[in-house]
């Protein structure tokens, strides 16, 4: 009897796998870490092969810790970071690093898109990063048969089937109600060739993609009877997990960044610095409106990496204890959390972080 399901979270710092029963109780879980590389200020990259390895290791350990047999797993779905962009062949092969969601190298492309379309996209978004690749790495772009996101790449390697997520594609000009991408948007950019490299069809969260391939089943320690269903952006799927899935609800997601997302019948914000996605970005009939910051928890990790190497794995717990003795106002120390630019309210990828008020 296949009574259990697996949820995978492909996050910034690693892959986490959870085994759930039919009531939603967690029976087992595991985390496998991978590295982020920062080759230049404002850049952030990861190796796609590291994702596959981490997902395999975390799933195997989660199933083991749950004490269930692989033959009892019915389905698997994954949520990942976005927009984390990569190029690959039709067979999912790539030697190039993925451009991580927090990467701000496409600032100029974001401004160009704004000038030509009247919108003001974040440099985090897929079209901006894809346009950067075409302009700065034309051979890579020309050779690529697929330009996709982490979500799409992972699902392909699990099932052997290309598709994209409605949840991510709505950030690229996909209209769920029409079932098509906005070709006019890409024509304004003279970038319609990208449409031929986007993996289709677009599937909504929960829709079946297909069973695990034999190779994927072996890597994960499962069997080919496991169905893979479409997931979405980690923050969006987290919102569903919190039960914030009706018009008029909102949720705050925290991690390497933070994001406050609200579901409304109509766009909530009118400021060009704000961001609305939809319609039907996550929940049919709803727009999704966002606010948040690119660098939050990632700054804590930066501080740990640069200044707390001798404290070991529990460095953050030790910092928590030290912080309890710091008075309100932090003795005048102020931190602007712009390590990777500002997401809201300025939507400025070029600004950088600041620690102000240092003294002897």
Residue ranges and their predicted role:
Residues 34-45, 163-169, 192-199, 355-360:
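Gly-rich Lys/Arg/Thr-decorated short loops/hinges at beta-loop-alpha junctions or inter-strand turns
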Residues 77-80, 148-151, 232, 243, ...:
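Short beta-strand segments
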Residues 1-31, 38, 70, 74-111, ...:
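Glycine/Thr-rich phosphate-binding loops that ligate phosphate moieties of nucleotide
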Residues 20-21, 86-89, 133-135, 156-157, ...:
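Short beta-strand-to-turn element immediately C-terminal to the catalytic PLP-Schiff-base lysine
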Residues 30-69, 118:
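N-terminal phosphate-binding loop and adjacent alpha-helix
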Residues 2, 10-12, 23, 117-233, ...:
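Gly/Ser/Thr-rich active-site cleft segment
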Residues 229-286:
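Acidic, glycine-rich loop-and-beta core segments that form the ion-binding/anion-interacting portion
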